[in-house]
Amino acid sequence: MNDRVLRVLEFNKIKELVKGYAITKSAKEMVLDLKPYDSVYDVKEHLEETKEALDILMRKGNPPFEGLYDVKEAITRAEKGGVLSIEGLLRIGNMLSVTRKLSDFLARKEEEEEHRILEGMREGLIVLRGVESAISKAIVSEDEIADSASDKLYSIRRSLKEKNSSIRDKVNSIVRSNAQYLQDSLYTVRGDRYVIPVKAEYKSQVPGLVHDQSSTGATLFIEPTALVNLNNEIKELMLKERAEIERILAELSALVYKNIDVIKVNFNIIVELDFIFAKAKYGSDLGGTMPIVNEEGVIDLMDARHPLIPKDKVVSSDIYLGREFSTLLITGPNTGGKTVTLKTTGLIELMGLSGLLIPASENSSISFFEEIFADIGDEQSIEQSLSTFSSHMTNIVKIMEKANNKSFVLFDELGAGTDPTEGAALAISILENLRARGCRIMSTTHYSELKGYALKTENVENASVEFNVETLRPTYRLLIGVPGKSNAFEISRRLGLKDNVIEEAKKVISTESLQFEDLIQSLQEKSIKAENDAREAAILRNDAEKYKNRYKEKFERIESVRDNVYADARREAKQILDSAKEEADAILKNMRDLERMGISSDARRKLEAERGKLRDKISDAEARLQKKKEEQKGEELKKIEVGMEALLPSINQKVIVLSKPDNKGEVQVQAGIMKINVKAKDLRVAKETKEEKKIKKREARLNLRQVDPSIDLRGMDSEEACYTADKYLDDAYVAGRGEVTLVHGKGTGVLRKAINDMLKKHPHVKSHRLGEYGEGGTGVTVVILK
């Protein structure tokens, strides 16, 4: 990919943002080297790795990179067999700790989805617990070795501590006895030796070795003779300590050298993971998605946003190219937002082809291009003192030398900077030449000739950026299929140009041109209306789909409950019959035994008695089954009242009646949290046990206290608010509340209207009104329940 397009479309700014999420210097360098990949396979693989990292971020949070430093220099030194510094070893130890933690972090549990690429990288990580443990045991910080690094070091430092304690006692005694000769009653250290500050004129009074003097020469730092031997002993111990530390560092460095190949592989994988998660973190904050990548030259971006414009200011657009048409001409006035659309498309393509998530909705598509060319801005004319036209044409010549059917070409104000007639003719010729090669092209222009060219040329489409004449600002919404209107007359009028001047200007323009501009304006208005209608239709379609799915789930739950009830009944009936059959078999066996014994009068009596038992058992089983059927069927309701409790045998559950029977003989009932319509004739009298009656009385006393007199629906969308209010009204009705308040806020009125529409159809609502002064005004609705 050519460097000019990366610079012109400000891809470097995107890389700077991504770099801020990387931790190691090496990963930051990888980000700065990032550019579109050379094959569609590489593009898809790098997009997939970013998407996998985003999935893990969403599910597990940030990976455990804490304490990670770039260890490239330490590894290079270790590879040569050099002794590493305390800092270098500590950083390698931390890197090995991160290796272990990352391996655990990326391990997939059975219930988790597979992440092919990142799990493959995890398999390359080799945990070196022994090396990590040896370093962490020996090194405390970047400039300190632990006492426990070796027994010898521990012994040396203990001796040093004792010697230092002894010499401090000795030097304090000397300071006290020679106080009159000293500048300060303190001791200090020079060159690792304890000394005292003696006034220069009294140096003969304190025998010893002079180690230093003050800048004025008034003070000499003398090591008293009495301290020389102790200082020598401390110095010897310090030399031993330094030698032992060097031995420990050499030993640890040798351990690192022994495992250097594994350490190097681990570090390279960690750097790559750092790079991948930096891309994912940026994509997450951007609200980015993984695009679908094709090789057919098709671009289809839904709700595309320029990634460098702040979220609170950016306007999204649907941008598509490559199916019905291969060239898109964005027309309209200057400062109309055309260039932003051009840059948005080009920059999103560069991001996607570089493995970054794009600022667009799910299922957006980008195409793999071998080259993207852009002629935007006057960069070259400023650098080389060329005219605007010469600058653009120089760049266009270079583009036309290289562009082919795998190229995407972006032109800003093609043909501008020269005579309009010649400029338009050149622009059309350039477009035709590139179209013949199979290029995909997006170009902005304000030439009317190019609008006509797009209208009459196959595979070329007009587009415009919506412009608000009232505010004299573009809305940045792209309208594909509608050429742009210059709005020069209207803008001039808004800025204060006299009407008579504008009317004179209109006379200069041909009637056909004016009619063409009016036609464009009419097309724009119709396009905007159609787009708004389509957006509203999509919202309604989504709402309908949600309701459909919700009631489908309810129906499936009811069916499941009913099937379970039937299954329970069948099991119980089978148990009764099986029990009766077992007893009957036992009686029949007794009868056969009696018959084999011979038929005596006594035997006949016993036989008849057993036959009687059999008849009784069968009759008893039949009676129990019949009773079970009657219990399940229940007593029919003679009168149905709203609010009464009834039994619904099909689900073997008590329900609350919510409405009177309609013309189909159906009533609405509530079963738990579900509302369903059933035939009134299917309802039965609900019989209560004594315990249920006691519980119901207690609930009746508590219900009124449990249901609040108002509910706050602010902050919810219309669907959620209506669902919540519906459930609240049911609870309030059952609790016996006569009046409740729904708080929806004032806002735009959308939520209030949705609530109002719901209340008109609600079976429990007698009437409703907006709140009065002191009740919340138009921000609340007061509901009277039946």
UniProtKB/Swiss-Prot annotation:
Which SMART domains does the entry mention? MUTSac, MUTSd, SMR
Could you tell me which InterPro entries the record lists for this protein?
DNA_mismatch_repair_MutS_C, DNA_mismatch_repair_MutS_core, DNA_mismatch_repair_MutS_sf, MSSS, MutS, MutS2, P-loop_NTPase, Smr_dom
GO terms of biological process kind: mismatch repair; negative regulation of DNA recombination; rescue of stalled ribosome
Q: What is its EC number?
A: 3.1.-.-, 3.6.4.-
Any Pfam family: MutS_V
Q: What family name appears in the similarity comment?
A: Belongs to the DNA mismatch repair MutS family. MutS2 subfamily.
Q: What is this protein called?
A: Endonuclease MutS2
Organism the protein comes from: Clostridium perfringens (strain ATCC 13124 / DSM 756 / JCM 1290 / NCIMB 6125 / NCTC 8237 / Type A)
Please name the taxonomic classification of the source: Bacteria, Bacillati, Bacillota, Clostridia, Eubacteriales
Tell me what gene encodes this: mutS2
